[in-house]
Amino acid sequence: MLENWSTVYDLEKIINDIFILHKNNNNKKFSTNILISGKSGIGKTQILDQICKKNNLKLKVVQAYQYGEFITGLPLVNNDITKFTKAEWVQEVLDENPDVIMFDDAHLIRSEYLNHFYETLTFRIFQSTQLNKNSIFVLIGNWGIDAAFFNDIPLPIMSRMNYIFKFEPNLNKWIEWGLNNNIDKRIINYLSYFKDEFIINSDVNEIVISPRNWEYFSEALKNGLQLDYFDTCLGVKIGNKFKDFLLVLDKSLDELLTLAKDKNLKESEKIAIIVALGNYDNAYKNKSITDYISSLNDDRIVLWITIISQKYKMEDNYKEILEFKKYIQKQFPSIYEVYNK
């Protein structure tokens, strides 16, 4: 499986196809320039990195601020003659001869350097230095409503793009990626129900939450982040909600089933009970658990089924997955068809 976060369309497949078309374009009459735009922290850079690795393509990442700040290189004075070294990134590109050159955070290229950038995109020339004409150029950035108040992409640059993509992360794909990349299981379990919290804008929460936040939060949890500091990663509202969720997960089976009778539970605590019962060993074979789950509405039952499925996938326990599917088909036939898909 390709390890990345996917878009609402299959972006990795499309870019793979573009790379193949470029490779088969023997005369290279036209350069291949790709623009991938979207909000910060949603995995634009990672998806390109993983696609290049999958296709054994050498990738060179150029940070956009380097393009402007080092456009002339460093001055070398010899008597009365001053020459300039090649910009550092240009020399690296010449030395490494990459298949793909990615300009990360391309919206940071200062407007006074856009003419030079246009020349680079069109002719693969930078300050009279010829770059590899066969290299694919990929611009990664945030434009339009995602611009974060930096430069909008001007029309001449846009006209040089052969392919333009608006990147939107997909939670289901991210969860699939997370199961294979050691994202904390409790985060995956939480987002399996609270799907609207995968991405949150600042007008809803004190801080913007993106897939990158959840990835950083996962690392912080593994490194022993204390409960009192959850709000530094997720904001006060979501941080406290996740804290309530987490505290329930550590309870014993008897404590969980007793707590489930409490009429004053918060929503996050109710969901945590279902998650904890899903992660219990042989959960679907335990009558006290299945009796409680059977009393719930369908969306809560689906969550419980999802948690058990995720657990078996992480364990590579395919034998148990098959047995569990048989159980669902027998006990919840109306849900089985959706689950099986």
Q: At which residue positions do the language-model features occur?
A:
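C-terminal regulatory/interaction module of P-loop NTP-utilizing enzymes
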Residues: 1-101, 105-341
